[in-house]
């Protein structure tokens, strides 16, 4: 069971995302910057070795603290060497201090088994949670309480938390 959990908690945004175009990640960053133009802190979970959206977001929201997390220590080490504030973290046993004060927590292409954990984490720290699925998979169609967003070809689902600091641009 622990092997399954470890695999489930691993980033799904490592090598598979490297096949996505930079335009795809740019569109994600644009969407987030429109939704959270006054964010003070945003955390991407499961960055892996594909920090493309995060890097774009840093340039769009220069006043915000942009943080990355991943379960893979080597990926986190590489992110830190790139000047990205990154932490080793497991969504199944999150270090809530990493997420405290976040306006938004997001995950690009999360495995379905992580979605309830992401929602729980968002509730605990008072942050909104945004997920960008690989495709319009069936398990995304029945997310009670989540808003479906579509912008410039990007489909996302947003679960609003209790963060009073956000200023939605959409």
Name the predicted role of every residue range.
Residues 79:
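Conserved SAM-binding loop
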Residues 113-169:
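C-terminal substrate-binding/active-site "lid" region of AdoMet-derived donor-dependent transferases
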Residues 49-62:
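Conserved SAM-binding loop of SAM-dependent methyltransferases across substrates and taxa
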Residues 96-104:
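A short acidic, Gly/Pro-enriched loop at the edge of an enzyme's catalytic core
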Residues 1-38:
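S-adenosyl-L-methionine
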Residues 72:
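Conserved SAM/SAH-binding beta-strand->alpha-helix loop
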Residues 39-50:
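Conserved class I S-adenosyl-L-methionine
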Residues 82-94:
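Conserved SAM-binding strand-loop segment of SAM-dependent methyltransferases
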């Amino acid at each position: 069971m622990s092997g399954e959990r470890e695999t489930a908690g691993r980033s799904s945004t490592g090598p598979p995302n490297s096949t996505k175009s930079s335009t795809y990640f740019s569109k994600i960053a644009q969407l987030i910057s429109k939704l959270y133009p006054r964010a003070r802190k945003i955390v991407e979970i499961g960055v892996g070795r594909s920090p493309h959206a995060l890097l774009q977001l840093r340039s769009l929201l220069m006043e915000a603290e942009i943080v990355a997390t991943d379960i893979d220590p080597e990926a986190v080490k590489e992110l830190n060497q790139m000047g990205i504030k990154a932490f080793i973290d497991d969504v199944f046993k999150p270090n809530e201090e990493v997420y405290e004060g976040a306006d938004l927590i997001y995950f690009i292409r999360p495995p379905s088994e992580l979605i309830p954990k992401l929602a729980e984490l968002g509730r605990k720290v008072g942050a909104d949670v945004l997920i960008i699925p690989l495709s319009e998979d069936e398990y995304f169609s029945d997310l009670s309480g989540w808003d479906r967003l579509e912008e410039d070809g990007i489909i996302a689902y947003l679960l609003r938390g209790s963060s009073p600091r956000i200023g939605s641009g959409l």
